[in-house]
UniProtKB/Swiss-Prot annotation:
This is Virion membrane protein A21 homolog. Envelope protein part of the entry-fusion complex responsible for the virus membrane fusion with host cell membrane during virus entry. It comes from the Viruses. It is found in: Virion membrane. Envelope protein part of a stable entry-fusion complex (EFC) which is at least composed of proteins A16, A21, A28, G3, G9, H2, J5, and L5. Formation of the viral membrane is necessary for the assembly of the complex. It is a single-pass type III membrane protein. Contains two intramolecular disulfide bonds. They are created by the viral disulfide bond formation pathway, a poxvirus-specific pathway that operates on the cytoplasmic side of the MV membranes. It comes from Fowlpox virus (strain NVSL) (FPV). Its main location: virion.
Amino acid sequence: MFVLFLIVCYFILIFNIIVPKIADKLRLEHEAFTKYRQIYGNKFRCIGDNLINYSFTPFGVKANYLVNKNTKMPAICNDIKNINSLIAVTCDDASKFIKHRNICERAYTELFL
């Protein structure tokens, strides 16, 4: 009986504390993303000499940046002219590109501050 009580308390904790915090986080991210899209649309923006874009997923906002297909180096703002040689990388995939972590940091800073 005591174990059943602990299980019930656990679910009450999850649904009353944790779930509302996650929902609030997603609401704030969606508001920031909506404001960004109203101002800039779906275009890549030059932030810190890198081309950045954002997408909204069920898990929140993801920053995307462009890299060269061949060299895997981040594209600079002037590379937008050669769009066929570029691929988009999300900051979630950026673990492969540890040296480029500051690009993602700057992108999220621009969106939320």
